[in-house]
């Protein structure tokens, strides 16, 4: 059934309640996406061995590095569509929809080509261990074949989020997630396909979710309707998406680049530490996505209220999203750290792998609330229309700082503990600078409103 896109008003009513109702399905959707990866890792670790587990895990940072630039563009689509929706600009929403879906497909095919043909070279540049690089390359090539569908899902779901719809994408992912788990078991256990099987299961399930979400846009009767016969770029919409999305994508890429450097450092400790790091980071991802739902809520709510000129709501959006994200990080991060050992045993029965994973979780999970707060502050800046500023802050505060840390402190104290400490140090410094920038932007906006009111 087609949905009336005029029902997603995020500018009035009890703001905290709306943020929570918006974020819960979003968090559940993100967790389901992580379950795709978790199913891969658990099935491989249990039924294909620690070498195959390391092969799948060693790809995570590299995949994020290549994908995040274009995922940032989908955030640009979300901001532009939300602002047009808040301003009741139906033509702007329509142009954004057609442009966004086209951009998603084009970027997906580009990533598929680059990822497939450059897989081995990129893994070698990351110092991927020799005993896993063959399997890692195979997994990466198959994974990137499905990239057009992954990008199509990201852009289509971003458009639905812009009008407050986070429930229907959740249903689509639930269906795809069930398919992914079943196919993992069939391909790995029944057909003994190892990493090739889990990669194939992932791209099949992502294709299902992409087709379902895109079908929702096609069935829309309001301005969010997608006309597949008129796909193409609208210059005005494309320019706005790129203005917001490119800096956001570059910021995500900056984080991923520093993670690639850290992954290379992890690789220097051998396949056991790589496997433990892979399992731990997969578990941490559940904490992060729960927090990040409130960062995504912050950018959508801020964008709609900017479009509707409800500037009085902006501070409430920031405070509520910040509170929810920090509390979520504190509760889930602390819980994951306390239950780290039994949770890691889901991924591997090898005690040395579990011990290596715990070394990471005790540092990252207990400080993850800093990352959540940092993301919310950056999202509030983006929603207000400042896209370059949070990118520059992240470039210096995260990428540069982590690179310096790896080149100096980690070289002096060559331990995994000192390596993992680079995360919380960069989070807190970057968050403080984001907060300072947001306060300056807020003051400037208030002064401009006072001047406009006096005219």
Regions found by a protein language model. Give the residues of each.
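Short alpha-helical transmembrane segments in multi-pass integral membrane proteins
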Residues: 1-23, 81-146, 179-182, 190-246, ...
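N-terminal transmembrane alpha-helices
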Residues: 10-47, 61-76, 80, 105-112, ...
């Amino acid at each position: 059934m087609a949905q009336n896109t005029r029902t997603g008003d995020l500018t009035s009513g009890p703001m905290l309640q709306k943020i929570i109702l918006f974020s819960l399905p979003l968090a559940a959707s993100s967790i389901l996406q992580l379950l795709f990866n978790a199913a891969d890792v658990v099935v491989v670790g249990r039924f294909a061995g620690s070498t195959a587990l390391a092969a799948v895990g060693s790809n995570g940072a590299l995949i994020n590095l290549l994908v995040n630039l274009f995922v940032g563009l989908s955030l640009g689509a979300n901001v532009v569509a939300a602002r047009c929706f808040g301003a009741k600009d139906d033509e702007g929403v329509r142009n954004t929809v057609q442009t966004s879906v086209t951009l998603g497909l084009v970027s997906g095919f580009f990533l598929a080509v680059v990822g497939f043909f450059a897989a081995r070279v990129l893994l070698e540049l990351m110092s991927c261990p020799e005993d896993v690089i063959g399997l890692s390359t195979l997994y990466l090539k198959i994974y990137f074949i499905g990239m057009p569908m992954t990008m199509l899902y990201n852009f289509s779901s971003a458009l639905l989020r812009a009008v407050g719809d986070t429930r229907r994408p959740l249903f689509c992912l639930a269906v795809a997630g069930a398919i992914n788990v079943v196919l993992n078991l069939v391909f790995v256990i029944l057909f003994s396909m190892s990493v090739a099987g889990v990669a194939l299961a992932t791209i099949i399930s992502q294709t299902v979710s992409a087709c379902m979400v895109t079908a929702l846009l096609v069935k829309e009767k309001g301005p969010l309707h997608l006309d597949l016969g008129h796909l193409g770029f609208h210059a005005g919409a494309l320019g706005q998406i790129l203005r917001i999305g490119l800096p956001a994508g570059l910021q995500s890429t900056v984080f991923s680049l520093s993670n690639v450097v850290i992954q290379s450092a992890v690789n220097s400790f051998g396949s056991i530490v790589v496997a433990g790091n892979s399992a731990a980071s997969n578990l941490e991802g559940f904490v992060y996505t729960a927090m990040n739902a409130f960062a995504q809520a912050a950018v959508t709510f801020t964008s709609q209220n900017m479009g509707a000129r409800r500037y009085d709501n902006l501070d409430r959006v920031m405070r509520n999203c910040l509170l929810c994200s920090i509390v979520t990080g504190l509760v889930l991060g602390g819980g994951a750290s306390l239950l780290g050992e039994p949770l890691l045993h889901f991924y591997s029965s090898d005690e040395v792998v579990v011990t290596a994973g715990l070394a990471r979780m005790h540092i990252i999970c207990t400080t993850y609330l800093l990352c959540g707060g940092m993301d919310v502050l950056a999202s509030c800046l983006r929603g207000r229309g400042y896209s370059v500023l949070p990118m520059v802050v992240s470039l210096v505060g995260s990428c540069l700082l982590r690179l310096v840390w790896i080149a100096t402190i980690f070289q002096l104290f060559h331990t995994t503990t000192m390596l993992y400490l680079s995360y919380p140090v960069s989070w807190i410094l970057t968050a403080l600078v984001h907060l300072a920038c947001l306060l300056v932007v807020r003051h400037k906006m208030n002064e401009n409103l006072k001047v406009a009111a006096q005219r």
